[in-house]
């Protein structure tokens, strides 16, 4: 079976690398997430981030109040309206993360070779000799002489002088006496503690996480919950139960794999989660440096085979303080794309970085170049070999057969675009799973789902959630606009032509169900149609919000439009 390293199609010649790119307006297929914070929360900066390529906004509740994050989200909504660009929202939990408590206002200076004690006594003030931590007890954690401990600022890069590596010398009850391995000054918004090989038995959701989900998440109909320090599939079940209890049944769960326990149970986690985040910062503390690439490639491949979108963190840390990445960082970003990553999640670069917008532009540009070299056909064949054959297989349901056929047809005719009509977004995810070389325009058609006396409106959340899927551009259809007659397809092509996704004469693949129009409402066989842009009448010279399709909006917007 093909493996990750074969998904690279080299350029025709080294000289071709020097040629100027022909079309810089086409966005990268790889999705780009940004951690929003002090340097990236104004309307102006958020507008620039959206234009630069941000598709996922991460609100990290490891720090900051609900009021602070609400103000940032309100600004993001204004920025989305102003730019007419969609962006999905992600609530990142604190989980069982350990932090330093009772910090003084002044930074804490530490010297290599000195003794530093970690204590679970929460009444002690943090100082140069002792750090109180938020974990209740060291008993049963596996902490022992020789254990390695890392203490650093929130979203540490590893290159700053505000992090310290400790070696445990002695464990006495709930205190661990350590030796500092390096000199540093501990500072930053929050100090996190990472103990290698620790058995962390704290609840997967902290009390603050429960409040954030039930209040902030429910009020804002958040699209994803990113579950920090996911240890097993049971942890995902816990957060799903909480989401269901507060009316967030449509919210999806992204499992963050960032410790050894999560690595051990990665197979079950990938199967249970809706998507996966490979947190290389924290996982890199638990693994030897020479083993990190193995974990990365295996996890990416597992997610690819399962059809679960996977994002990766910690790519261009240098750009937190510098306007350009290192050559190694640039190569790393490209290799992530070639290894099968669906998205990149930026942390300190956009949270506190001096060059947030430039970072997004740079990473997107690197991703676009890597996508040009991605061997889509070899990747497609590797998935089909995994399922067993090129025809309908027991492992391939109707939707997956339709999705894989659409991607294969697009490759055969060199299509410029795949159009998918969907209610739930499921078919869009399945098409994206096969990583076609062209974009996927997903028309999300709102629908009402009935469960007894409970009615749920589908559409708005599903459209935003599609922003996490590689190559997918979702647009909303007006609920009052009916599908028969193919008019909505004409509008979809008109929009694609307006934004430069297709030109006259381009081939387009359309995936839909002939009876309902939706490709994921399949009580009968779906259809893959091959069309040419010129074959369809363009209903109007310009797309506006008066048309039945538009890129951004909420159900409130739709209701106002129809008044």
What spans do the regions from the language model cover?
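Non-catalytic helical/linker scaffolds that mediate oligomerization, partner binding
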Residues: 1-563
């Amino acid at each position: 079976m093909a493996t990750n390293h074969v998904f690279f199609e080299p350029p025709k010649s080294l000289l071709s690398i020097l040629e100027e790119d022909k079309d810089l307006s086409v966005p990268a297929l790889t999705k780009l997430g940004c951690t929003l914070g002090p340097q990236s929360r104004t309307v102006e900066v958020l507008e620039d981030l959206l234009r630069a390529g941000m598709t996922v906004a991460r609100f990290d509740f490891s720090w900051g109040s609900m009021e602070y994050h609400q103000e940032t989200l309100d600004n993001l909504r204004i920025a989305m309206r102003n730019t007419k660009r969609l962006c999905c929202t992600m609530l990142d939990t604190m989980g069982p993360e350990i932090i330093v408590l009772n910090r003084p206002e002044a930074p804490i200076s530490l010297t290599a070779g000195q003794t530093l004690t970690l204590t679970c006594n929460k009444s002690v003030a943090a100082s140069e000799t002792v750090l109180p931590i938020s974990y209740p007890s060291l008993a049963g954690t596996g902490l022992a002489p020789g254990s390695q401990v890392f203490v650093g600022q929130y979203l540490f890069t590893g290159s700053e002088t505000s992090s310290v590596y400790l070696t445990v010398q002695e464990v006495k009850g709930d205190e661990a006496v350590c030796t500092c391995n390096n000199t540093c000054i501990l500072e930053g918004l929050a100090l996190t503690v990472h103990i290698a090989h620790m058995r962390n038995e704290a609840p997967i959701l902290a009390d603050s996480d429960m409040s954030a989900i039930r209040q902030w998440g429910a009020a804002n109909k958040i699209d994803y919950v990113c579950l920090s320090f996911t240890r097993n599939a049971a942890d995902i079940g816990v957060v799903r139960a909480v989401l269901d209890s507060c009316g967030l049944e449509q919210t999806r769960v992204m499992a963050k794999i960032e410790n050894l326990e999560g690595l051990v149970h990665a197979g079950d986690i990938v199967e249970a989660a809706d998507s996966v985040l490979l947190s290389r910062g924290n996982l890199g503390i638990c693994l030897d440096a020479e083993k990190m690439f193995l974990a990365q490639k295996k996890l990416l491949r597992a997610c690819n085979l399962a059809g679960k979108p996977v994002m990766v963190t910690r790519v261009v840390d240098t750009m937190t303080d510098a306007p350009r990445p290192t050559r190694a960082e640039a190569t790393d970003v490209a290799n992530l794309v070639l290894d099968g990553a669906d998205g990149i999640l930026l942390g300190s670069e956009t949270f506190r970085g001096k060059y947030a917008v430039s970072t997004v532009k740079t990473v997107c540009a690197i991703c676009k170049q890597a996508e040009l070299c991605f061997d889509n056909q070899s990747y497609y064949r590797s998935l089909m070999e995994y399922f067993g054959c090129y025809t309908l297989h027991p492992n391939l349901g109707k939707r997956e057969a339709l999705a894989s056929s659409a991607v294969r047809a697009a490759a055969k005719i060199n299509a410029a675009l795949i159009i998918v009509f969907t209610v739930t977004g499921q078919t869009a995810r399945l098409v994206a799973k096969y990583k076609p070389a062209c974009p996927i325009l997903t028309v999300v058609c709102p629908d009402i789902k009935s469960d007894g006396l409970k009615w749920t409106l589908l559409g708005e959340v599903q459209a935003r959630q599609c922003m996490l899927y590689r190559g997918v551009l979702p647009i909303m259809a007006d609920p009052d606009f009916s599908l028969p007659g193919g008019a909505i397809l004409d509008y979809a092509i008109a929009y694609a032509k307006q934004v430069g996704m297709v030109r006259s004469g381009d081939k387009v693949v359309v995936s839909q169900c002939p009876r309902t129009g939706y490709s994921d409402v399949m009580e009968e066989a779906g259809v893959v149609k091959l069309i040419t842009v010129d074959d369809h009448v363009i209903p109007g010279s310009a797309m506006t919000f008066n048309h039945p399709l538009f890129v951004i909006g909420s159900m409130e917007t739709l209701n106002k439009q129809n008044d």
